[in-house]
C-alpha cells in the first residue's frame, strides 16, 4: 500500500471495496459477516489493485480491478472484476456509500455479474445505525439469476464495556429461482469487552426461510474474539 496526501494505492492480495465500508460500519464481523459477504454477493479479498482519492472532507471515490475469483483462485483468463465507489459525508457521523461492480465471465454462454449497492448510516460515540440495499444480476454468471436484499442494523454502547446490537436481513431471488436459500434473518445480542484484547458476544438468531412448508429456525451462539 502507498499513500500521499489525498491519494491511496493498494496492490497485491488486497481487501476488496465492494462491502468493506459496510463491514466496518457494522463492526461485528466476528459475530456475523456483512450482508454481501454473508450471502456471497462478492469476495472480501482478491488479487489486484485499488485506488482511492479524497476530493474533499465530504466526498471521496475509489476504483478497483481484481482477479474476480476471490483470494482462493488466482486467474485472469476468465475475466476481471471492476468496481467504482463513492462515499459521501454530508454531516459529521452521517455517511452514504454507493457502489457498482462488473465481474466478467470470460466463458461462452456465461453472463457478467453486476453488483449494485447503496448504504447509509450514522455513527455516534453512544450508538450506530445503518441500512443497505444490494442487487446482484446474473449470480454465478447465470442469466436472470438475480438476487437482492437489504440489511438494517443498530448498536448501543453501554457503560463498563458492554454493547447491545440488533440486525435484520432480508434476501430475495428473482422469480424465486433460489427460493430454497431465500430467507429473512434476525440477530440480537450483547458484547462484553474483557480487557483490551478479548470480546465475548452471546446472541440469539432466527432464520425465516421463504420456501413453503419450511419452518423458522432458532439458535443461540456465543462468539469470541481474541486479537492484538
Residue positions per predicted region:
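Outer membrane beta-barrel
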Residues: 1-68, 78-83, 87-96, 153-156, ...
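Transmembrane beta-strands of outer-membrane beta-barrel pores
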Residues: 4, 13-17, 65-69, 100-106, ...
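Outer-membrane beta-barrel domain signature
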Residues: 36-42, 70-75, 104-111, 139-143, ...
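Residues that define the transmembrane beta-barrel architecture of outer-membrane proteins
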Residues: 43-47, 78-82, 112-116, 146-150, ...
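Outer-membrane beta-barrel porins/channels
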Residues: 67-68, 111-112, 126, 192, ...
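Detector for outer-membrane/organellar transmembrane beta-barrel domains
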Residues: 77, 85-175
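Outer-membrane beta-barrel "beta-signal"
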Residues: 88, 192, 216-228
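Outer membrane beta-barrel transmembrane domains
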Residues: 151-157, 161-201, 205
